[in-house]
Amino acid sequence: LLGLPEDAPERKAIRLINPINEDLSLMRTTLAPQMIHAIARNQKNGCLEGRVYEIGNKFIPKDLPLTEYPDERETICIGIWGKEENFFTLKGLVDTVAETLFIDFEYVEDKKTFLHPYRTAKILYNGEEIGYLGQLTYEIQKEEDMRESAYIAEIDLKALRPVYGKVPTFAPISRFAKETRDLALVMSKSVTCGE
């Protein structure tokens, strides 16, 4: 489904010896396939716009075959779709996760086989990659019979555990009124939004 290359870390899944059924024979290394299926199922049932999320665990083996327990990572996967949804709507939702924890994420251009090449970014926190966001490729949307564009994000919550429950500090309100201005900039296409 994701079109991952053979050496992709997401392909290094742990196979269960006695699964409930063949569809559940691998421990998840990403929540993306289930989110893609959930979005497709909703669209097939007539829900042409929506937002869903899942908080679940993914299991990253240190070595295969297993010699020690895998790294279990609590992860949130967010999916949105519809005429009014776009990359920046999803980025706003991811920023809301950061604001809730009183932290800032950084976004850097990225490439993933299942996401649109120019509408994809990796999410960094303190310089460490903790997730990604982007639009599903047209090929996946067509393969899953999606009628509306879909976007997904995946964030490693385990990497954010150190900031859970920290009390923020606040600055006093300024005595001077805030002024906002509308500003348009003209620059080269090679300049990224982070610069």
Positions of predicted regions on the chain:
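Extended beta-strand-rich architecture
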Residues: L1-E195
